[in-house]
Amino acid sequence: MKVRNSLKSLLTRHRENRLVRRKGRLYVINKTQRRFKARQG
C-alpha cells in the first residue's frame, strides 16, 4: 500500500478506483487492480 499526501491524482489513474473513509483515514481501493491501493498520510 502506498502512502500519499494527495489521493486525487491516484484516483484518476483507473476507472474502478474508489475513495473510502475508514477510521478517520482516506483510502483508495480497487477490487480488480489491487496495485492501486493507497492511504492518505
UniProtKB/Swiss-Prot annotation:
Keyword Lyase annotated: no
Membrane spanning stretches: none
GO MF: structural constituent of ribosome
The organism's place on the tree of life at top rank: Bacteria
GO BP of this protein: translation
SUPFAM superfamilies for this protein: Ribosomal protein L36
Keywords for the protein's UniProt record, in alphabetical order: Ribonucleoprotein, Ribosomal protein
GO CC list: ribonucleoprotein complex; ribosome
HAMAP family per the UniProt record, alphabetical: Ribosomal_bL36
Assigned protein family: Belongs to the bacterial ribosomal protein bL36 family.
The protein, known as: Large ribosomal subunit protein bL36
Originating species: Rhodopseudomonas palustris (strain TIE-1)
